[in-house]
Amino acid sequence: MKKLKAEMWDKVQYIFRNYYDGMIHCAIVYRGKVDETLLRRAIKLVVDKVDVLHSSFVAHPIDPYWRVNDDYTEEEMLDVVYGDVSHEKIEELLVRHVDYRGKLQFKATLVKESGDKSVLCFVINHICCDGRDFIRLTSRI
């Protein structure tokens, strides 16, 4: 089993997990058709390179760490929903929480309208990256 050392900020975020929203929330609007198969593949290529995105936080009382998970699939990385892109739907997808004990440290849903508009709703555990890292991450997808 591969482990990653938990940094001080990981531990602080874990301790305060019940007091504030430790997630980064983002909605990316696409004009034109989005191929969900290619998007899934792009997400997987990035996630494969960044171990913490496919790790579970183990809250060991003395020495917490990240357990790297290798048993994830492309299908788990992106949900696809068909229908109208409403503010209510986007908000519903953006207020979700990512469980630090889960296999993946993000949730991504592509909402595809019947026309040429799609919205990628992305929620990622802030422990994994800050805002600048998130911009770099999503620009590679």
Model-derived regions: residue spans:
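N-terminal beta-alpha "docking/capping" segments at the starts of catalytic domains
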Residues: 1-36, 41
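Acyl-thioester-dependent condensation/acyltransferase catalytic cores
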Residues: 40-139
